[in-house]
Swiss-Prot record:
It holds the Pfam family Pur_DNA_glyco. InterPro entries: Formyl_transferase-like_C_sf, MPG, MPG_sf. It is an enzyme of class 3 (hydrolase). Belongs to the DNA glycosylase MPG family. It comes from the Bacteria. This is Putative 3-methyladenine DNA glycosylase. Its EC number is 3.2.2.-. GO terms for molecular function: alkylbase DNA N-glycosylase activity; DNA binding. GO terms for biological process: base-excision repair. It comes from Chlamydia abortus (strain DSM 27085 / S26/3). The keyword DNA repair applies.
Length: 190
């Protein structure tokens, strides 16, 4: 697994790209599932108007962003979907990387059951941040959980491919930060 020191880099854009191709692993409730990280978004507080910690705003929900890098920041979006972020950087520097999509690697059958995805297109199983959490069983219970633990970690194993950058999704309110290419996608060659 990646050491805690990996997550302490203060350059969240670098880490959002560097996480691509690594395998996100969960071993929860006796079931192991994992996926290759293929899409991320960087959130760089305090200046990023799309970031929960814009202008050093602190709420009960976003407090994990102010922790040392290497923990999970999981929150509910629209009161329905859990979203999983990797907290990066040093204490009190509110940076995080949203894991937007994975490519199933281990336990795809378990992911299908968790998502009730039988007889549906496999390429849509984990192609969104809420779907990732459902497939890997990442719930609010694991908010602030160490990402260097047997239960949840990111493997040193890394797949390569072509990386593209695009604007982040769903942040129309973020003014000049709306169109920055802080979303990173990995296209793995077969």
């Amino acid at each position: 697994m990646l050491p805690e020191s990996f997550f302490l880099n203060d350059d969240v854009l670098y880490l959002a790209k560097e996480l691509l191709g690594h395998v996100l692993v969960t071993h929860l409730e006796g079931q192991r599932t994992s996926g290759i990280i293929i899409e991320t978004e960087a959130y760089r507080g305090p200046e990023d108007k799309a970031c929960h910690a814009y202008n050093y705003r602190k709420t009960q929900r976003n407090l994990p962003m102010y922790s040392r890098g290497g923990i999970a920041y999981i929150y509910r979006c629209y009161g329905m979907h859990s979203l999983f972020n990797v907290v990066t950087g040093h204490q009190d520097l509110p940076h995080a990387v949203l894991i937007r999509a994975i490519l199933p690697y281990e336990g795809e059958d378990i992911m299908v059951l968790r998502r009730q995805w039988q007889n549906k297109p496999k390429h849509l199983l984990t192609n969104g941040p809420g779907k990732v959490c459902q497939a890997l069983n990442l719930t609010l219970e694991y908010n602030t959980h160490s990402l260097s633990s047997p239960q949840i970690h990111i493997s040193k194993k890394k797949f390569s491919g072509t990386i593209t950058q695009k604007p982040r999704i769903g942040i129309d309110y973020a003014q000049e930060y709306r169109d920055l290419p802080w979303r990173f996608l990995l296209h793995i060659k077969n």
